[in-house]
Amino acid sequence: MNVLPELVKSNYHIHTNFSVCAAKNMTVPYIILQAKKAGLEKIALVDHDHDNWDELLEKTNYRKNEVQEINPDIDVIVGAELSAYGINKYGVDEDTNEQIDFRLYATNHYHLDFWEHPQNKTAPAYAEHTLQILKNLIVSGRADCIAHPFVGFYLRGILDDFTEVTRSISDNELADILELGVQHNVSWELNTKAIYADPIFAKRLWRIGRDVETTFVIGTDAHQIFEIEERKVIELKLATILS
C-alpha cells in the first residue's frame, strides 16, 4: 500500500563498508543499531556490484552470516545494488543474479567510466536511453526494484541542468514504464536523495505511480550512519515534497 506512514517503516537502500563509497563504520552491527534507533522495521543491505565484481556472492553470504549471528529483532535483507549499465548490458551474469535475495538495479550511474552513454549527450537522449535500459531490464526478470529511477543527478558533469532529463520524459511515457513494472512485479525506489535533488519530478513519479498501482519502496541510499534517518523525519520531509 502506497501510504507514507507504512512505507517509511522500511529502508531498502543501505550500503555497508563493502561498498568503496561507504564510510568505514558502516558495519552490520552498527547499521542495525541505528536502524532500530530510527524506528525501522525492515532494512536492505545493498552493496555495489562494481566494487565487488569477483566476490559479490561471497561477500553477500558473509553479510548474511553476520545478520544470522546477530539475530536482530528487525527484518534484514542482504541483497545488492546491481548495474544495468547499458541497453541489455548487465554487471553480473544470470546465475549470479538469481542468487541475490534482493536485486536493486541502477540504470543511471552515468558517472562510472564503464557506463554506456547515448551517442548524443543531450537531456532528451539520456531520457530515451534510460527508458530503453529500463524496458529491457524489466522484461528480463532480473530486477526486484529500480534504484533512484530516471533522475539525472549523475550527469552533473555533462548537463548544465540535470533535471532536464526527467522533464524530457512525458507523463504517458512515465505511466507506460511504471505499468510495465507492475506487470513484471518490479518495484520502484522512492530514493530520498533523488527526491530532494529533483522534487518536481518526484511529485510526478508519486502521482502517476499511484494512479497505475505501482509498488514503491523507500531508500535513503545510506553511505553513512546518519543517512539512516528516523522514519518520522523521512515521513515529514516526503509528505511536504510529494503532496
Kindly label every feature range from the protein language model.
Residues M1-G86, D95, R156-S168, D176-I177, ...:
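An N-terminally biased module of ancient metal coordination in phosphate/nucleic-acid-related enzymes
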